[in-house]
């Protein structure tokens, strides 16, 4: 491979964009590798997870900081619906300051930690707080850095299962791309309603489609990025709300805050945030695969079209959505979880191209150091067990 997204590798390196381009591009290959890896590691995670998931009193807490938190927020509604289990998603940044408001001390808890570096202060503190406060705590750690503090925490502990994502997922660029999608996919495969064997067919179809999209979408995405929008609103319901939050952050990060972003649900936008839509705004709406939920998506789309205030509108949909020029049918899937990944790929490509269009450096959009790849400056305070 001499480059990515029609860019020469040397040009990308000169623009400090090579890592980001490669890490977005490689994702379909990593997803296939992840499925195979989980099959090979089944003897490690299955004896740990199966007894826990069979307990009807178990609460599953998906947690992380920043993008890692959004992976959980994208999956939690889908997991609740498809498995009937009690699944919630909280930021470690919330849990650390007020653990008693988020951790249920009356129930066995499986804490699922998403972490790229595995060294974020809040991630380690949340795990330690869970073990300190919960009478029955278990940990599934989905990490990208095998040498991280979080991965090392699993050693010699029976209540911890640590799984390292495929090689290459520990992004070297500032923004989380491969790491985010691999951790999200691993949780969907391990905690979802299908076995790995049952998930292979829809996963393979999604991987094949995303391999096509990374080739075919680039001209359209590049034109959007060059259009000059200065505001960006991402919209999606249920699991797509979490994905919209991630897409919003990715644009904010890679454009170093030069493009103002916001996320919401299709129904939530009308309750005030719609004021943000003006003639400098790109609105991105992620359509659900479900007929019922998609009615609400379609109503807002039509309303925004009638308003005529947005600079541009783009819809991302499965092939059941009627086509128009501004709605892109990215993948045919009967389940929202398999739309998460092609939608994510589009939003990552758009943020990357927008960074280049603004003459920024995607691999490190903040070279002056005020915002860092691994968070700095956080002091963790000891939490006394007597505090409630």
Question: Locations of the language-model features?
Answer:
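Conserved phosphate/anionic-ligand binding catalytic regions in large, soluble enzymes, centered on
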Residues: 17-20, 67-78, 234, 238, ...
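Glycine-rich phosphate-binding loops that contact phosphosugars or nucleotide phosphates
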Residues: 53-203, 286-331, 350
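Short, charged, surface-exposed secondary-structure boundary motifs
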Residues: 98-100, 171-176, 270-271, 337-344
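Short, positively charged patches
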Residues: 15-18, 25-27, 45-46, 59, ...
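Phosphate-moiety recognition in structured ligand-binding domains
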Residues: 1-23, 28-34, 155-159, 198, ...
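Hydrophobic alpha-helical scaffolding
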Residues: 10, 14, 65, 113-116, ...
């Amino acid at each position: 491979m001499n480059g990515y997204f029609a860019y020469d590798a040397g040009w990308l390196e000169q623009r400090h964009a090579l890592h980001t381009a490669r890490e977005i591009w490689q994702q379909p290959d990593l997803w296939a590798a992840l499925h195979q890896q989980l099959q090979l590691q089944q003897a490690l995670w299955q004896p740990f997870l199966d007894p826990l998931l069979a307990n009807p009193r178990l609460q599953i807490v998906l947690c992380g900081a920043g993008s890692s938190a959004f992976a959980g927020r994208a999956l939690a509604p889908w997991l609740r619906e498809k498995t009937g289990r009690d699944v919630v998603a909280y930021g470690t940044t919330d849990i650390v300051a007020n653990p008693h408001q988020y951790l249920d001390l009356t129930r066995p808890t499986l804490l699922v930690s998403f972490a790229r570096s595995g060294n974020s202060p809040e991630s380690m503190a949340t795990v330690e707080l869970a073990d300190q406060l919960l009478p029955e705590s278990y940990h599934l750690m989905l990490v990208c850095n095998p040498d991280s503090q979080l991965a090392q925490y699993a050693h010699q502990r029976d209540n911890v299962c640590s799984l390292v994502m495929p090689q290459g997922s520990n992004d070297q660029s500032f923004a989380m791309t491969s790491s985010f999608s691999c951790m999200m996919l691993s949780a969907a495969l391990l905690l979802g309603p299908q076995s790995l064997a049952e998930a292979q067919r829809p996963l393979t179809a999604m991987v094949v489609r995303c391999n096509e999209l990374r080739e075919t979408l680039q001209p359209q995405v590049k034109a959007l990025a060059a259009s000059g929008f200065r505001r960006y609103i991402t919209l999606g319901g249920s699991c797509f709300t979490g994905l919209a939050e991630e897409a919003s952050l990715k644009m904010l990060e890679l454009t170093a805050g030069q493009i103002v972003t916001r996320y919401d649900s299709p129904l939530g936008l009308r309750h005030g945030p719609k004021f943000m839509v003006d003639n400098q705004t790109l609105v991105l709406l992620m359509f659900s695969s479900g007929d019922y939920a998609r009615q609400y998506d379609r109503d807002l789309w039509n309303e925004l079209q009638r308003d005529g205030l947005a600079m541009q509108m783009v819809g991302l949909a499965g092939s059941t959505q009627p086509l128009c020029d501004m709605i892109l049918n990215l993948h045919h899937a009967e389940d929202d979880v398999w739309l998460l990944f092609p939608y994510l790929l589009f939003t990552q490509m758009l943020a990357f191209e927008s960074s280049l269009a603004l003459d920024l450096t995607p691999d490190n959009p903040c070279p002056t150091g005020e915002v860092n790849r691994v968070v700095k400056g956080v002091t963790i305070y000891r939490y006394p067990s007597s505090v409630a």
